[in-house]
């Protein structure tokens, strides 16, 4: 089974992430940031990953450290669960609409961290959640999962819809990329022979 459990303890946050890449979308989320839990639920359900997240952090200051460190820890868990990358599809992409909003996410398990994030949020907050933290979550993820990730909100008016379509598309693209290809069961998906 492709599973991982990762803990991250700093002076700012204490985080545990448990992940099953071949799950059914079950989730148990307690990040301490309610809107982040809502977005993590999108990743789990649309990626069909079993995901548990427990986090405590210095949210009395703001949510920055918790959101970023959950992204870091999730990235580490994905990298650990994938292992040597043999047999994975490697690339994934998804378009997701929600009413007036449309977002696209493309991912490559290249081993080269890179993030292109183009989401022109229409307001600064969704409830109490600072939408600027969305890029911090994904930056933490890519740097520790070792992926190239392109995120584009093509259109949208409602900032909640912008966030939600991004996270749903991310879950679906991630699911596609980590899917095992039985035709390439024991091979690395690269002409270099390594990723």
From Swiss-Prot:
| Main location as per UniProt | cytoplasm
* InterPro entries linked to this entry: IGPD_sf (IPR038494), ImidazoleglycerolP_deHydtase (IPR000807), ImidazoleglycerP_deHydtase_CS (IPR020565), Ribosomal_Su5_D2-typ_SF (IPR020568)
Q: Where located?
A: Cytoplasm
Q: Which UniProt keywords apply?
A: Amino-acid biosynthesis, Cytoplasm, Histidine biosynthesis, Lyase
Q: In which pathway does it act?
A: Amino-acid biosynthesis; L-histidine biosynthesis; L-histidine from 5-phospho-alpha-D-ribose 1-diphosphate: step 6/9
One MF term from GO for this chain?
imidazoleglycerol-phosphate dehydratase activity
Gene, per the UniProt record: hisB
Its recorded name reads Imidazoleglycerol-phosphate dehydratase
User: According to its UniProt record, which protein family does this protein belong to?
Assistant: Belongs to the imidazoleglycerol-phosphate dehydratase family.
A cellular component term, taken from the record's GO annotations = cytoplasm
Q: Does the keyword Lyase apply?
A: yes
């Amino acid at each position: 089974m492709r599973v991982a459990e990762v803990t991250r303890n700093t002076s700012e946050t204490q985080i545990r992430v448990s992940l099953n890449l071949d799950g059914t979308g079950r989730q148990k989320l307690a990040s301490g940031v309610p809107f982040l839990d809502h977005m993590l639920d999108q990743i789990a359900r649309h990626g069909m990953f079993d995901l548990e997240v427990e986090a405590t952090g210095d949210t009395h200051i703001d949510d920055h450290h918790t959101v970023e460190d959950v992204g870091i820890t999730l990235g580490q868990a994905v990298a650990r669960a994938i292992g040597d990358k043999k047999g994975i599809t490697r690339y994934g992409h998804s378009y997701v609409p929600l009413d007036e909003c449309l977002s696209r996410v493309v991912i490559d398990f290249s081993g080269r961290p890179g993030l292109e994030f183009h989401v022109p949020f229409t307001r600064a907050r969704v409830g109490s959640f600072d939408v600027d933290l969305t890029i911090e979550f994904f930056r933490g993820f890519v740097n520790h999962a070792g992926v190239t990730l392109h995120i584009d909100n093509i259109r949208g008016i409602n900032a909640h819809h912008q966030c939600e379509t991004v996270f749903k598309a991310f879950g679906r693209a991630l699911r596609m990329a980590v899917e095992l290809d039985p035709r390439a069961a024991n091979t690395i998906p690269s002409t270099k022979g390594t990723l």
